[in-house]
């Protein structure tokens, strides 16, 4: 896992894989990507952040959910609800049929909520889930419980159930959110860090409401600027025919090689990269542990996906050229010291 993250970081890939229309390079014989319906696009960011979908969602999101996928999904719901520490109850779920129909998926999700003392849970799966707005039915109001359930439908039900119960219990990560008002203008400032923990999501309703109320969302860097990220990737690597070993001491180079091996790479796997690029990457990796989100969706990336899928204007306060230029302009001595310090954990 660390090996894959290292590759992504060194390549300068900081944008989320969670936008509604990802760019896919595929063979002519590959099946067409399965795109989410318009009504589900707004649910993608939270679904991905909570692990309900992964980077490969365009290969299965419109397919009928499998029993294995449903089991994994209900496991995520169970883990999220357990964090609420709600009073438990003896759940009367005997006779509920759990299968891959819409009704079966509703029953599976209801079973997780029925273990807790929640208002309305005693009314049964359909009444409880519709009452929360988890299941909204078709235009005629039908729940279509006998129809096969797509992964997309199950994902949205699970995401809505988690958010509804977290919101009802005033739960979720609040972070550090400031609000400034001047006349008709409102500015929200949210403190973020470029990584997360697996229990960060969902964010508190106050944070999501601030996002919903915003017309423009500004970041340190535009995570959708592919040209900028490509430029940063170029700045990170040597283009003059030299390698890392030509720019740092033999002792420090040996430590870099040892770190590469510990990450499952070849000893010379970092030869193409400059000291500052490696130092930044090792610094991020040193902060990761077993609680780091496995989907690597840092708060910045979550908010970007949320905002883009909602059609909001994206802005940034810096450019990749500006930020990359600062790092690339560091003296050779400073870069070597920076890399040396970042290797303390290896």
Place the predicted regions along the sequence by residue.
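Structured, acidic catalytic/metal-binding patches in enzyme active sites
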Residues: 176-177, 181-346
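N-terminal low-complexity, Pro/Thr/Ser-rich intrinsically disordered segments
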Residues: 28-36, 166-179
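Surface-exposed patches in mature extracellular/periplasmic domains of secreted proteins
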Residues: 56-60, 168, 267-273
């Amino acid at each position: 896992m660390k090996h894959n993250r290292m590759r992504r970081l060194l390549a300068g890939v900081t944008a989320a894989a969670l936008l509604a229309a990802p760019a896919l390079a595929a063979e002519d014989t590959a099946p067409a990507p399965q795109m989410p319906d318009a009504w589900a696009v707004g649910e993608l960011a939270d679904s991905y952040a909570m692990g309900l979908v992964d980077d490969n969602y365009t290969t299965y999101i419109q397919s009928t959910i499998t029993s294995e996928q449903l089991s994994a999904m209900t496991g995520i719901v169970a883990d999220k609800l357990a964090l609420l520490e709600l009073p438990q109850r003896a759940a009367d779920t005997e006779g509920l049929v759990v299968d891959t129909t819409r009704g079966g998926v509703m029953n599976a999700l209801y079973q997780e909520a029925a273990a807790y003392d929640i208002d309305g849970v005693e009314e049964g799966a359909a009444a409880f889930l519709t009452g929360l707005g988890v299941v909204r039915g078709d235009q005629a109001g039908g729940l279509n419980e006998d129809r096969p359930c797509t992964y997309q439908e199950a994902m949205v039900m699970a995401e809505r159930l988690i958010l509804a119960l977290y919101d009802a219990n005033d739960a979720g990560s609040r972070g550090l959110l400031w609000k400034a008002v001047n006349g008709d203008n409102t500015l929200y400032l949210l403190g973020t860090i470029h990584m997360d923990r697996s229990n960060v999501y969902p964010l508190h309703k106050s944070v999501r409401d601030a996002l919903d109320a915003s017309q423009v969302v500004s970041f340190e860097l535009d995570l959708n600027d592919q040209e900028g990220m490509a430029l940063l990737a170029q700045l990170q690597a040597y283009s003059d025919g030299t390698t890392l070993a030509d720019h740092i001491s033999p002792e420090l180079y040996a430590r870099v090689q040892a770190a590469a091996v510990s990450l499952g790479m070849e000893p010379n796997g970092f030869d193409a990269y400059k000291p500052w690029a490696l130092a930044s990457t090792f610094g991020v990796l040193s902060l990761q542990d077993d609680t780091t989100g496995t989907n690597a969706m840092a708060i910045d990336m979550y908010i970007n996906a949320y905002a883009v899928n909602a059609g909001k204007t994206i802005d940034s306060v810096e450019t990749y050229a500006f930020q990359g230029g600062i790092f690339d302009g560091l003296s050779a001595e400073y870069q070597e010291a920076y890399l040396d310090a970042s290797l303390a954990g290896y």
